[in-house]
C-alpha cells in the first residue's frame, strides 16, 4: 500500500461475488489503494434505497454488506474504510443508458450517493446484446470496461473533470459486440418507452427500448449515450447529482396567491 496513491472505494449493485466487481477491483489496484464495500447479494434496480442498519461480513474482496449500493457507499465512507478520493461503482452486467435509468440503477445511484458527499465518482456498466443476456460472464469479459475506467480514474480527479461534473456514467460495449475502442463524451438519451400489460392478477412491465435495441431499431441522435454504445464506442456522460432547480416566474405567482 502506497500512502501517496489515491484511496478508491469500489462498490456495485450486482453483488460482491459478481465477476464485474472483481475485474474492476483488480484493475483499479494499479491506480490506487482499493477498498471494496459491496452488497452481499444482487441489488439491481434498487436506486438510492437506504437502510437504517446493515449487517457487514468480511469477504476476500473486502466487505459484504446486507444492504443496497447506497448503503455501501455511506458505510464505506463513514465507517468501514479510509475516506476515499474516488468512488467507483460497477462493472454492471448490462448497460445503464438513458436519462430514465439514472434514478433506477443501483450502479449509478451509488455514484450519486458519493456525489452528495462531495466525493468524485464513476459508475461503469458493460452493454450486452440481447442474445448475451442469460449467459454467464467471466472476469475477462469486463476487460474493455475496466480499461476505460482505469484510464479515467488515472486522470479525471487531477485534471479537474470533477470541478464541473459530480460523477461520470460510463458504458462500454461487450468486447464481442464490435467494440471500436474509441471513447466519446455523451449526454444521456431522453428516449423512454415503458408499457405494461395485465393478464389476470398480474401486470407485466415492458421496457420497449431494450426490444428496439435488440432489433437495431433506435433513433437516438449522435452525441447520446445509447447511440455511442450501439456504434461500438465507450460512452462517458459527465453528470451532476439530482436534482437541478430553476427559477419559475409562473410558480412564484401561484405560491404568492396561496
Swiss-Prot record:
| Keyword list, A-Z | Cytoplasm, Hydrolase, Metal-binding, Nucleotide-binding
The Swiss-Prot or TrEMBL record lists the needed cofactor(s) as: a divalent metal cation
Q: Which InterPro entries match?
A: SurE, SurE-like_Pase/nucleotidase, SurE-like_sf
A Gene Ontology term for the protein's cellular component = cytoplasm
Q: Where is this region: Disordered?
A: 237-258
What EC number is given for this enzyme? 3.1.3.5
Q: Which Pfam families match?
A: SurE (PF01975)
Give the UniProt subcellular location, in the record's own words. Cytoplasm
Q: Name one GO molecular function term.
A: metal ion binding
Q: Keyword check for RNA-binding, yes or no.
A: no
Q: Which reaction does it catalyse?
A: a ribonucleoside 5'-phosphate + H2O = a ribonucleoside + phosphate
**Family that this chain belongs to:** Belongs to the SurE nucleotidase family.
PANTHER family tied to this protein? 5'-NUCLEOTIDASE SURE, PHOSPHATASE, PUTATIVE (AFU_ORTHOLOGUE AFUA_4G01070)-RELATED
Name by which UniProt lists this protein: 5'-nucleotidase SurE
Q: Which organism is it from?
A: Halobacterium salinarum (strain ATCC 700922 / JCM 11081 / NRC-1) (Halobacterium halobium)
**Name of the coding gene:** surE
Amino acid at each position: 500500500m502506497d500512502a501517496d496513491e489515491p484511496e478508491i472505494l469500489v462498490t456495485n449493485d450486482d453483488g460482491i461475488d459478481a465477476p464485474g466487481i472483481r475485474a474492476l477491483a483488480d484493475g483499479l489496484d494499479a491506480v490506487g489503494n482499493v477498498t471494496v464495500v459491496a452488497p452481499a447479494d444482487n441489488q439491481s434496480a434498487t436506486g438510492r434505497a437506504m437502510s437504517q442498519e446493515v449487517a457487514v461480513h468480511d469477504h476476500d474482496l473486502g466487505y459484504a454488506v446486507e444492504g443496497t449500493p447506497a448503503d455501501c457507499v455511506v458505510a464505506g465512507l463513514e465507517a468501514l474504510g479510509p475516506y476515499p478520493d474516488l468512488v467507483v461503482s460497477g462493472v454492471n452486467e448490462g448497460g445503464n443508458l438513458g436519462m430514465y435509468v439514472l434514478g433506477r440503477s443501483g450502479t449509478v445511484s451509488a455514484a450519486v450517493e458519493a456525489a452528495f458527499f462531495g466525493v468524485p465518482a464513476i459508475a461503469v456498466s458493460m452493454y450486452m446484446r440481447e442474445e448475451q443476456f442469460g449467459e454467464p460472464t467471466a472476469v475477462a469479459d469486463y476487460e474493455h470496461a475496466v480499461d476505460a475506467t482505469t484510464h479515467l480514474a488515472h486522470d479525471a480527479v487531477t485534471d479537474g473533470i470533477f470541478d464541473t461534473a459530480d460523477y461520470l456514467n460510463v458504458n462500454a460495449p461487450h468486447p464481442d459486440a464490435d467494440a471500436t475502442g474509441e471513447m466519446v463524451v455523451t449526454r444521456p438519451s431522453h428516449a423512454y418507452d415503458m408499457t405494461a400489460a395485465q393478464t389476470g392478477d398480474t401486470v407485466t412491465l415492458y421496457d420497449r427500448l431494450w426490444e428496439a435495441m435488440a432489433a437495431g431499431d433506435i433513433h437516438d441522435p449522435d452525441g447520446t449515450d445509447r447511440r455511442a454504445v450501439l456504434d461500438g464506442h465507450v460512452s462517458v456522460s459527465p453528470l451532476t447529482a439530482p436534482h437541478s432547480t430553476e427559477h419559475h416566474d409562473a410558480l412564484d405567482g401561484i405560491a404568492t396567491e396561496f
